[in-house]
Amino acid sequence: MKVIKVENQVQGGKVAFEILKEKLANGAQTLGLATGSSPLEFYKEIVESNLDFSNLTSVNLDEYVGLDGDNPQSYRYFMQENLFNQKPFKESFLPRGVKDNAEAEVERYNQILADHPVDLQILGIGRNGHIGFNEPGTPFDSQTHLVELDQSTIEANARFFAKIEDVPTQAISMGIKNILDAKSIILFAYGESKAEAIAGTVSGPVTENLPASSLQNHPDVTIIADAEALSLLEK
């Protein structure tokens, strides 16, 4: 596991973009993508570049259950606004947040992931150490599944909604096994609120109580983080 300390998210995006270019030069075909504020500067680097993504495939980590793709709070909408509209891929797959047939969607998405092995997976990390929407207690051998979101996750995401009652309580997420199946992984972490999770991810015991600690079992993980997120690691 490699840890790269950066000044801020802008520098973090540039560092990640250099890693991406190296992977593409070595034949990467499929990118695993994440939402949230952490990868935004990385996506800006992609959009502003002259790289052609029209022969590449993307798969996203997760999606809320109960939000249509045209809902501004859906992850599909986020990806369209921040990346896909400006830099189209050959194919871009996201879980569909269908409420009535979630189990069928789980099966569909697991098949997509089997058909499109991820070369480089992008991750953020939750305060409780979740990756994707894999909350504490998620088995490390899990594949795509329906998730009941932790209250801490709902509260963290409430800032994007008019009121906390509007935040979805379920999501469809890649499992931890799906994430670990990627050839390479970049995890972004910014801010003091992520410090405890990062300390456990890098140097704590590998435990299902901290989903991101599973990354210690992966051969090619790069953590890009600022001083605040690394503050407990450096003491």
Swiss-Prot record:
Recorded catalytic activity of this chain's protein: alpha-D-glucosamine 6-phosphate + H2O = beta-D-fructose 6-phosphate + NH4(+)
Active site, UniProt feature: 62 (proton acceptor), 128 (for ring-opening step), 130 (proton acceptor), 135 (for ring-opening step)
Role of this protein: Catalyzes the reversible isomerization-deamination of glucosamine 6-phosphate (GlcN6P) to form fructose 6-phosphate (Fru6P) and ammonium ion.
Any single Gene Ontology cellular-component annotation: cytoplasm
A Pfam entry, by short name: Glucosamine_iso
Family, per entry: Belongs to the glucosamine/galactosamine-6-phosphate isomerase family. NagB subfamily.
InterPro entries: Glc/Gal-6P_isomerase, Glucosamine6P_isomerase, Glucosamine6P_isomerase_CS, NagB/RpiA_transferase-like
Gene for this chain: nagB
Keywords: Carbohydrate metabolism, Hydrolase
Pathway membership, UniProt: Amino-sugar metabolism; N-acetylneuraminate degradation; D-fructose 6-phosphate from N-acetylneuraminate: step 5/5
Keyword Magnesium appears in the UniProt entry: no
Entry EC no(s): 3.5.99.6
UniProt keyword Lipid metabolism, yes or no: no
GO BP, sorted A to Z: carbohydrate metabolic process; glucosamine catabolic process; N-acetylglucosamine catabolic process; N-acetylneuraminate catabolic process
Name used for this protein in its record: Glucosamine-6-phosphate deaminase
Organism listed in the record: Streptococcus pneumoniae serotype 2 (strain D39 / NCTC 7466)
UniProt-recorded Gene Ontology molecular function terms: glucosamine-6-phosphate deaminase activity; identical protein binding
